[in-house]
């Protein structure tokens, strides 16, 4: 690795003599005391030998050489075969005091990759300017993202015909589970838009296939052993199943609207079910196109947009209720709780467990020891917002089936599972814990991780490769999933506790789970944007610029 050292005196540069003499014994007596090298556009870390501990970055855009244009031979070590006069040597020594000297740990070309690693480290550690957002394909991707999100919101404002919307909205405020689903749809259910089903049928289809993968070994092999091709097949099956779920939920919603329909006929039912199904398919398609942009998960971003659009109305109702009742203390408690909730979510979302790794063939260029920066990161909440989305959709399923079938037992179950019901909180916590544990091991299979580490020549200290490593990773993930489940359970139970303290229920539709979705999607998108910018910086760097050294 090429380092940059600051020389404090003329004699300090004599330490280069021993290392360079091994390369060329014949020219060792002709070495200059302080040689200036040709520098390509590298970003390399520096360290001072005396009284300097802070690292700093050097951006070298000029070709520096101790001689004039006569030096046309590739000479990266500064070994000049010509003798120089004493006056020239004194002058170059004076220049070396004013500029840093470049020292290479070895003179062969095998050190070039370590120089490239210096560039990579400098790129990853460098700050991102605001102007970087307007370079490369990133602006075009953001425009496409905004266009897709605007198109998904447009379907919310195209209503179904023949429905008394005012009467339906009045009944919607009294139904907690529909209010929660209305949050995920961005007010689409209340507005009776053709895209009011949103992404919920696709999420239900995902839940069903993930559960079926544990029952049918063929699906599990298709998901894990066949790689990307198998996952594409499961995604295709999920799309087909989402259409079926959309038809079922559309029929249930249409029959639920029967008391509010002016002319409830067969033609109206068929047309409404068709429009709602097509709206759900369109939303699912938009979500997949958003995922293809690699700026975040399409499903999460659609729900993120819906919650953001629902936030002003929800907060306005809460404020109006507090002002009407004179409950200023309760309003302040909600605001403080919201801020603390956001801080806690950000803290937990960024927390991770780092497991150190040892590589059999990865050494540092100077010390010759194992690289210390290699580790395996496991996030505390690695499942993200998906367990909450799955849990909410599962709790809404009995109410949908009850509206469709009219069975009294399902109505009782749906009533018990609504927010504020007797079984809502414990069932929600159990479902969140189950989906969090399941989704954690679905994303990170300990056997697969152990096999990949073994192929890469990596091992965990004091743990044998193979089954012992898989068991160790499984234990770590199990403990982390417990912490993540406890965190998600606090989010699920927190709003209910705040409601009991403040006696304000209008804020129920915007719960802690919604805040987690907002923060999770925002941090994930910010991370993807940062990765995109770093990728563009890598594309603009040439690690091997040997052409300009040719005579």
Curated annotation (Swiss-Prot):
Location comes to:
Plastid, Chloroplast thylakoid membrane
Q: What is its main location?
A: plastid
Q: Name one GO biological process term.
A: protein transport
Cellular component GO terms held in the UniProt record: chloroplast; chloroplast thylakoid membrane
Q: Where is the transit peptide?
A: 1-67
Tell me the null mutant phenotype: Seedling lethal. Albino seedlings with yellow and translucent (glassy) lateral organs when grown heterotrophically.
| Topology relative to the membrane | Multi-pass membrane protein
Q: Which UniProt keywords apply?
A: Chloroplast, Membrane, Plastid, Protein transport, Thylakoid, Transit peptide, Translocation, Transmembrane, Transmembrane helix, Transport
The portions of this protein that span the membrane are: 142-162, 192-212, 241-261, 268-288, 295-315, 328-348, 382-402, 415-435, 482-502, 503-523
Keyword Cell membrane carried by entry = no
Q: What else is known?
A: Cannot substitute for SCY2.
Q: Could you describe the subunit structure of this protein?
A: Part of the Sec protein translocation apparatus. Interacts with SECE1, ALB3 and probably with SECA1.
Q: Which family does it belong to?
A: Belongs to the SecY/SEC61-alpha family.
The record's function comment reads:
Involved in protein export. Probably interacts with other proteins to allow the translocation of proteins across the chloroplast thylakoid membranes. Required for normal greening during embryogenesis. Central subunit of the protein translocation channel SecYE. Consists of two halves formed by TMs 1-5 and 6-10. These two domains form a lateral gate at the front which open onto the bilayer between TMs 2 and 7, and are clamped together by SecE at the back.
Name the NCBIfam families on file: 3a0501s007
Q: Which HAMAP family match?
A: SecY (MF_01465)
**Record's protein name:** Preprotein translocase subunit SCY1, chloroplastic
**Which species does the entry assign this protein to?**
Arabidopsis thaliana (Mouse-ear cress)
Question: Where is the organism placed in the taxonomic lineage, from the top?
Answer: Eukaryota, Viridiplantae, Streptophyta, Embryophyta, Tracheophyta
